[in-house]
Amino acid sequence: MASLEMQGAYDLSNVKINELITEACEGNYALGIINEKTKKFVVKYVGRDSDLNACLKQHVGRHPKFKFSYASSSQAAFEKVCKNFHDFGGTKKLGNNFHPARPADTDWKCPCCDKFD
């Protein structure tokens, strides 16, 4: 079974985001819901950003829950969001309309497909 390897699930609110993520930092996130029967987090969208706090606040009201993890570098965040995107169904199952983009001015490859070959 695929794993996000993230902390949470937390309520997606400005208050909770500020409580958990107190400074601008690189990382990954997943947005979703809690399944009523299983009580498990259901991934609906995955992303990454260099400022998790600000980015997550842009999603408040779109999904009720979020998970997150810090990344050691931009490249690590990119590789993780690609893995999460593929592991959780890509555009067929997630709200992501496109494969995650790599940062400008990089030649990084997706670790799961040949999108950038």
Task: Please provide the spans of the model-predicted regions.
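Boundary/linker segments flanking structured domains
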Residues: 1-44, 48-117
